[in-house]
């Protein structure tokens, strides 16, 4: 048992050049946990609040000194002397001290950084790897799996400065036998995609998550480029590699007229038409997972989409559920989607994140662990994916160290666990077992 002796917050810089909160939690015996909060670009309206200073003279208003001050003062005072291994209690103290529904007093960025740093410090004090401690906190000690990567190799929407409406076009190396082999397949497809794009005279500049961000005439053209790259790399699309998309539909949904307006290809759809547009893409390409295929508030549209596609495609709720058990519970009751994206800064603590994963799994939904578009070298989500045996992870493409840090941590974990952490491949995806 080790008590907290010191909590430190500081302002550091994320992968987009914006400030974020880093926290250190120090325990008796010299054990230290260090963690940083990520930050999203396309955010759900019901996410926990990321506290920014709003001082335009400093970091264009994006400073986080208020959140850092909360860590160094109110949070530190409340936590010193508390037992670090009581993660749920630590998180509850911060949530109650904040006292708001959406963590707007201290900021989810402050509370999450401390929550994760505390878990890391507790793991260190127990002489355990973080993934093993997370499995204990999850009530599933010793139960692990290596996640199937969903690699975002063409970026559009809010993650790129191009004319592609759909935010992420991803590959899943389902033919791999191990996580390490999956990363090799992903890297080979990524490099071949660069050749395909260059051959078409298209840009190979990368977006926030390390994927390419070319100007393409349509979403189908993005899928066609990926198909060509998969084949060029010597793999079979649909067998070795499957496809996934994050539509981030809320970003092009017009609330006034209820239409999905895809400006990049000059098309507008009603809610049901958009579902059938996606259905058409699924018939043409082996797309096994679609995230946020409707606006976060269009629950009727989601219900229809689940009815049409839910038995054959994993339908992931991101902006829809925002890692929030209250919203997820309602979605489960109404038969909305069949999977949840897990981003721990949407809810703001490790305990609440684990509760969302458990609720999803208990209801037969899958849980996909995810990064944010603004990241740091912090690789906690790799341990979270393994320690909860979630089965799937989204942490970007095969470039940018902020993305690769997570993949490299997964390589280390797979090496340490060997056969104790099976790589499930396509079986991890809802509707594909």
Swiss-Prot record:
- Native organism is Histophilus somni (strain 2336)
Record's Gene3D superfamilies? Enolase-like C-terminal domain (3.20.20.120), Enolase-like, N-terminal domain (3.30.390.10)
Query: Coiled-coil annotation: which residues?
Result: none
Q: Which InterPro entries does the protein's record reference?
A: Enolase, Enolase-like_C_sf, Enolase-like_N, Enolase_C, Enolase_CS, Enolase_N
EC class of this enzyme? lyase
The EC number of this protein is 4.2.1.11
What is the name of the protein in this document?
Enolase
The UniProt entry's GO CC annotations, sorted and at most eight, read: cell surface; extracellular region; phosphopyruvate hydratase complex
Subcellular localization, as worded in the UniProt entry: Cytoplasm; Secreted; Cell surface
The UniProt entry, under SUPFAM superfamilies, shows: Enolase C-terminal domain-like, Enolase N-terminal domain-like
Catalysed reactions listed for this entry = (2R)-2-phosphoglycerate = phosphoenolpyruvate + H2O
Encoding gene (name): eno
For the ligand ((2R)-2-phosphoglycerate), the binding residues are 167, 343, 372-373, 394
As for family, the record states: Belongs to the enolase family.
Pathway recorded for this protein? Carbohydrate degradation; glycolysis; pyruvate from D-glyceraldehyde 3-phosphate: step 4/5
